[in-house]
């Protein structure tokens, strides 16, 4: 029986199908009354952890999320997918908007040490901020090896083999556990939570703690200056011939 334990980070984000609206004061995007769901890359990380457990390579899968009370819904989704228990690091909604990769990485590192896990899995990035920094920072705080953008994960005794896609093809890394791995899109296809598993998830434990309980200061060192909609695309003009194209480019001062 495997004795390895995995910690999986899950983030609550605005659903990918929702059209984002910027607040009138440009301090952020509208969050109230908007559908939220688990970050798609986090779903992939949960799926991979559960698959490792199903192969009896991992003993326990712990799902963790930082944010307001609604984050427990995201944790419940992870539990319905097969995670064993959850940890909610509660952050008031007013403060949660300022959570960045640095603060979350500090929390994950402390939890990894507290729970004595062997593997930290998380999505390579979140679709709301696209930072792609949390996994790397977590590994840095823990001084653990890291495998980012994983398209295949294989546990081999006290090591984990990570295959990752790079511009020139595939790169294979072999990391000594404990380690941090971030999931890429091609790692797996996440399962849908079935109704029976959703019902079972309601009975699974979610521990609620504060960042202060871990000795972590969530004060952000960054401030958002402005959030704006992308500029509207100007309609193009069709031209029939090369000569017309050259004339048009000259007209607008491009040549």
Swiss-Prot record:
Residues binding AMP, per UniProt: 9, 39-42, 66, 123-134
Keyword Oxidoreductase annotated: no
A molecular-function term among this protein's GO annotations: nucleotide binding
Modified residues (N6-succinyllysine): 210, 248
Pfam families per UniProt: ETF (PF01012)
Residues with the Phosphoserine modification: 223, 226
Keyword Phosphoprotein appears in the UniProt entry: yes
Modified residues (N6-acetyllysine): 200, 210, 238, 248
Family: Belongs to the ETF beta-subunit/FixA family.
The protein's name in its UniProt record: Electron transfer flavoprotein subunit beta
Gene: ETFB
